Amino acid sequence: MRKNKIFIRVDSGTKVGYGHLIRCLALAEYLQKDWKINFISRSLPGNIIHELEIKKFQVFRLKSNSNRMNQKNDAEKSISLIKKYGGEKNLVIVDNYELSKQWETHVKPYVKKLIVIDDLMNRKHYCDLIIDQNLHTKMNGLYEGL
């Protein structure tokens, strides 16, 4: 049976840290029984992308000339990979503080569901679901308007 695919857009490196990638790796290990997991990640200085490859996940490396991200360009590269290697029922999970509604607006038409992992609540999103693993005392309405 052919598995549906998940594309996880996450970065790691000396400036952005490693927590996002480690969190997504744990999620991918859980989901891989029922889904084909693919990672999309920039090759930033000090990245730990090799941790994904050690676990036998498909990794698509986006070239990065600097630590500054162009969301539209990043979205176009991600869409190209999703169209080339995905199917009809793709799911995208994004865990990246540098990506927001601008990136999501470009990507969403090409996927069945778009899920954002965000715990900052400091930028607008255009997605089907926001996951915040933190416990907040007042969860109701916390993400309204984002």
Indicate where each model-derived feature is located.
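Extreme N-terminal starter segment of soluble prokaryotic enzymes
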Residues: R2-F7
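Active-site and donor-binding regions of nucleotide-sugar-utilizing enzymes
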Residues: R9-Y18, R23-Y30, R42-G145
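A generic structural motif
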Residues: Q32-N38
